[in-house]
Amino acid sequence: MPYIYTNLFLAFLTSLLGMLIYRSHLMSSLLCLEGMMLSMFIMTSLTILNLHFTLSNMIPIILLVFAACEAAVGLALLVMVSNTYGLDYVQNLNLLQC
């Protein structure tokens, strides 16, 4: 069982490393954030199932709700930046005057 947690932790670290490397493009940053949230969701679900925490079964679902909200806001921002400037560079975000 520890191999599963090791793989999930490596998936989280790979997504974090991708976030640090490809931070200039908004689409790459959003994909890396989704990978981080997916690995956190699976890790919390497996931990709750293995340790038999019956009172905290809602934590992975709450995490998915926050991930969906983050994805919706990120995609709306991506559409707004790409329609305005034609590029998805993060440096264009401070040029938006909302």
Swiss-Prot record:
Protein location: Mitochondrion inner membrane
Keyword Mitochondrion applies: yes
Classification via Gene3D superfamilies: 1.10.287.3510
Transmembrane segment boundaries: 1-21, 29-49, 61-81
Major localization listed first in the record, in broad terms: mitochondrion
Membrane topology per record: Multi-pass membrane protein
This protein's record includes keyword Transmembrane helix: yes
Taxonomic superkingdom: Eukaryota
Keywords annotated in UniProt: Electron transport, Membrane, Mitochondrion, Mitochondrion inner membrane, NAD, Respiratory chain, Translocase, Transmembrane, Transmembrane helix, Transport, Ubiquinone
UniProt enzyme class: translocase
InterPro entries the record matches: NADH_UbQ_OxRdtase_chain4L/K (IPR001133), NUOK/Mnh_C1-like (IPR039428)
Assigned GO CC terms: mitochondrial inner membrane; respiratory chain complex I
One GO biological process term: ATP synthesis coupled electron transport
EC number: 7.1.1.2
GO function terms (MF aspect): NADH dehydrogenase (ubiquinone) activity
Catalytic activity: a ubiquinone + NADH + 5 H(+)(in) = a ubiquinol + NAD(+) + 4 H(+)(out)
A Pfam match: Oxidored_q2
Family: Belongs to the complex I subunit 4L family.
The protein's assembly and partners: Core subunit of respiratory chain NADH dehydrogenase (Complex I) which is composed of 45 different subunits.
Stated role: Core subunit of the mitochondrial membrane respiratory chain NADH dehydrogenase (Complex I) which catalyzes electron transfer from NADH through the respiratory chain, using ubiquinone as an electron acceptor. Part of the enzyme membrane arm which is embedded in the lipid bilayer and involved in proton translocation.
Protein name: NADH-ubiquinone oxidoreductase chain 4L
Protein source organism: Cephalopachus bancanus (Western tarsier)
